[in-house]
Amino acid sequence: MMMNGQKLAPAAEVAVQLPESKVAADNISGTMSGPLVGASGGGTTAAMRPFGRKAEVMHVLLRLLCIITSVAALSFMFTAQQSSTISIYGFMLPVQSKWSFSHSFEYLVGVSAAVAAHSLLQLLISMSRLLRKSPVIPSRSHAWLIFAGDQVFAYAMISAGAAASGVTNLNRTGIQHTALPNFCKPLQSFCDHVAVSIFFTFTSCFLLAASAVQEVIWLSRSKY
C-alpha cells in the first residue's frame, strides 16, 4: 500500500526531527534563563555589597568598641571629683575639684554622650542587617550619611580631648611665676580620672576615623 510504502518514511523523519528541535529549544531557553540571569544577579549583588562578610563584621566591631570607649570616657569624667587641702603661702586651704567646674570637661561629657548614642544607633542598624544577611551599608546615600556623621563626631572628640588636655596640663604643672601650685598633688584621684577619660576620648576618635576610612573604601568600590 501507499501508506506502507511512501508515507512511512516522511513520518519517521518527522518523528526523528521533533526531539532534535525540542532539545535545541531547551538548550536555548536554558542558556537564556540560566547563565545570563545568574551573571546579572551576581553583578548586582557584588555592586551592592563590595565588602565581604568579614569586613562587615569588622564594621560592627568598630561600632561596639566605639560605644565602649565613649562610655568609658563619659564615666571616668563624670566620676571625677575630689576634696582635699592645699598649702598656699603657708596657709592650708580646703579645695574641691569636680568635672562640672570646667567648661572643657562639660564639653567632653556632652560630646562623649553624643558619640555613644550615635554609635549605639549605628550598631543596632548594622546588627539587624547583618543578622538578616543583608548588606550592612545598603546604598551610597546611607554610606555618605554615616561617613559625614563619623567625621563630625571624630572632629568633636578631637576638640573635646584637646580642650580637656589643656586644663589637665595646667592642673598638673601649675602657673609659672605665681604661687599657684600643682593641684594634682592633693587631687591625685581627680586628675587620674580625667587623664583616663581623655585617653578613651582620643581612642574613640581613632575608632570613628577607622569607620570613616572603611566607608570611603565602600564608596570607592560601590557602583549604586
Swiss-Prot record:
> Can you tell me where the transmembrane regions are?
60-80, 107-127, 143-163, 193-213
Primary location recorded for the protein, binned into one broad class:
membrane
| Domain of life of the organism encoding this protein | Eukaryota
Classification via Pfam families: CASP_dom
Which loops or segments lie on the Extracellular side of the membrane, by the record? Answer: 81-106, 164-192
- Give a yes or no for keyword Glycoprotein in this entry: yes
Topology with regard to the membrane? Multi-pass membrane protein
Q: Which UniProt keywords apply?
A: Cell membrane, Glycoprotein, Membrane, Transmembrane, Transmembrane helix
**InterPro entries, sorted:** CASP/CASPL (IPR006459), CASP_dom (IPR006702)
Keyword Glycoprotein on entry: yes
Q: List the GO terms this entry assigns under cellular component, sorted alphabetically.
A: plasma membrane
Give compartment(s): Cell membrane
So which residues have sugars stuck on them?
A: N171
- Membrane side Cytoplasmic: residue ranges: 1-59, 128-142, 214-224
Enumerate the PANTHER family for this protein: CASP-LIKE PROTEIN 3A1, CASP-LIKE PROTEIN 4A4
Q: How does it assemble?
A: Homodimer and heterodimers.
NCBIfam families named among the record's database cross-references:
A_tha_TIGR01569
Q: Which family does it belong to?
A: Belongs to the Casparian strip membrane proteins (CASP) family.
What is the protein name stated in its UniProt record? CASP-like protein 3A1
From which source organism is this entry?
Populus trichocarpa
Organism placement in taxonomy: Eukaryota, Viridiplantae, Streptophyta, Embryophyta, Tracheophyta
